[in-house]
Amino acid sequence: MKNLSFINKLIYSANIIFALVLLFSFALPFFPPKTFSILSVLNLGVPFLVLCNVLFFLYWLFQLRKQLILSLLTLCLGYLMFGSIYKFSASKKIESPNNFKVMNFNVRLFNVYDWIPENNIESKIVDFVKTEAPDILSIQEYHPHKNVNLSFFKYKYEHVSGKKIKYGQAIFSKYRIINSGSVEFPNTPNNAIFVDIVKGKDTIRVYNVHLESLRINTRIEVLKTEDSERLLKRAGSTFKMQQLQTELFLEHKKKCKYRVIVCGDFNNTAYSYVYRKIKSDLNDAFKEAGNGFGRTYDFKFFPVRIDFIFADEAFKVNGFKSYNAHLSDHYPIMSTFALDD
């Protein structure tokens, strides 16, 4: 740092801090949240930390300074461990007579509390689903709204609870459902539900997983006034709950004898412990066939992917689409799969 100006020394000092924090974030998915519960919040900030390190790298590159090596090596390590946060390749789209489409969508109770200041959001969601025509629809924060008619799906399983407003999870299917159930999580309305569907000669299990929410208000004026210590403690407690919920789900899943598709809102990113554990040897449909950031949540500061569709290796991932439909605080995603005859 001897040959750096005072300003560049300050910038490089900041560069070191951001690189070290990002490196630490890369290690967190390999440790249970109960070990570093509060620090696990860094998982949510990985896209931001990556962006900062890209900017540092470009800054030093334009000056032809060797300080670029720090962020370059950090970013390369992250790429080797997790892949890129942005997929530059075009979305894969393979047509096949065996194709079927699976959509995941957290509908936020069909806007029953008017979070979005528009009329008929529930009808717009129904119209959107009808237009995109998934064969299987996985919904989190489902509410049996009087104006919601999804009868174009022949089969469904819903699990709802609540006194004043009933809500929960639901799976709709154009294929026959022969079995269904719920994996209950303690002390929360969140859960995981499943259905076994028959498609041709195959029986497929589809899970819909909704892990504990951080309950963070993304409005800037609210975040500015919220106590940071209380926010971190709440996040740490949430990550511990997510770990327990993940363990309960995986215990149920390992008893399944069918090929599996896992959909859900994990309320955590692809750099988290719960993502790594649930994904395990499954394929992330976005990584296989998507493009761009794959944003699934309306966070104001940077693109966040917290909703996922996974499938075991028996399924070919023939397509993936992230939608920019502003009908909830989440964005819908849909994957196209195929099973060989």
Show the residue positions of the predicted features.
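Acidic/histidine-rich helix-loop elements
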Residues: 104-120, 215-238
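Short amphipathic alpha-helical segments
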Residues: 149-152, 220, 273-276
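Active-site environment of divalent metal-dependent phosphoester hydrolases
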Residues: 109-113, 143-147, 163-166, 189, ...
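Metal-dependent phosphoester-hydrolase catalytic domains
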Residues: 8-22, 27-60, 69, 251-260, ...
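N-terminal, active-site-proximal structural segment of metallo-dependent hydrolase catalytic domains
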Residues: 1-150, 247, 340-341
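Structured beta-strand-rich core segments of catalytic domains in phosphoester-bond hydrolases
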Residues: 75-97, 123-127, 135-217, 321-325
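Active-site beta-strand/loop signature of hydrolases that rely on acidic residues for catalysis
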Residues: 101-107, 121-147, 195, 205-209, ...
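Short, solvent-exposed loop/turn segments at secondary-structure boundaries
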Residues: 113-119, 183-184, 297-300, 323
